[in-house]
Amino acid sequence: MVSKNQIKLISSLHQKKYRIAHQLFIAEGVKGINELLQSNFELEHLYVTIDEFKSVSTTQKTVISDADLKKISALTTPNTCLAVFKI
């Protein structure tokens, strides 16, 4: 379950000043997240829909509803997962 504070934090990361202040950034989509996981970026947290929950093998994951994912996504049609990485 995603708290309101987490939703506010992730939504704030759409703006550059908050990404710099929190030293975090957002990645959306399975392919982009997998590429970042294979690189040197450190995963802060991963939010996935129930459909993708079993296919992800990290311990830092949370199931998120489609409605909440739509709230925090920068895309008009959100993907099934969203990750927050440390800069």
Residue map of PLM features:
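Short beta-strand elements of ligand-binding domains
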Residues: 48-49, 62-64, 85
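A generic secondary-structure signal marking the coil-to-beta-strand transition
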Residues: 23-24, 44, 60, 79-81
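Active-site regions of enzymes building and remodeling cell-envelope glycoconjugates
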Residues: 56-69
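Short gly/ser-rich anion-binding loops that grip negatively charged ligand groups
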Residues: 23, 62, 71-74
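Boundary-proximal intrinsically disordered activation/regulatory segments immediately upstream
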Residues: 1-51
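Short loop/helix-cap segments at secondary-structure boundaries that form the rim of catalytic
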Residues: 52-59, 75
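Hydrophobic alpha-helical segments and helix pairs
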Residues: 70-87
